[in-house]
């Protein structure tokens, strides 16, 4: 505390400490894959991506077999389409917990994070699309004295 400020002129002469934005670097393993974990509701997806022909495997099965509904397949493809990287990466993921919709959301979240690990410059595009944000909505717990979380038992006057 040797340098005490005596006047406002000295205060304005002080330079604020410049805080730089964090530099995002490429994070790949020894096999050239980027890894990320995605979550949605009760589902957790572990996702690995590497450059390839655009093949997507979910729990050792083709994406068309695992996610039969076209909406779920489209959901998984969204980060790749937004980043203009459709068909350029092979995706291998294992997903557990929850239902199919939650699992598709978890894979999408993990795939987005893995893309940012592989190509940090895609972070802005994916963040703008909302793919890097974990959807925190989960099922509300059941309360005592209630039929479900909020539903009351049927009222009877007599």
Curated annotation (Swiss-Prot):
GO terms for biological process: translation. One of its GO terms (molecular function) is RNA binding. PROSITE patterns: RIBOSOMAL_S9. The gene is rpsI. Keywords: Ribonucleoprotein, Ribosomal protein. The keyword Iron does not apply. Disulfide bonds: none annotated. It comes from the Bacteria. InterPro entries: Ribosomal_Su5_D2-typ_SF (IPR020568), Ribosomal_uS9 (IPR000754), Ribosomal_uS9_bac/plastid (IPR023035), Ribosomal_uS9_CS (IPR020574), Ribsml_uS5_D2-typ_fold_subgr (IPR014721). This is Small ribosomal subunit protein uS9. GO terms for cellular component: cytosolic small ribosomal subunit. Belongs to the universal ribosomal protein uS9 family.
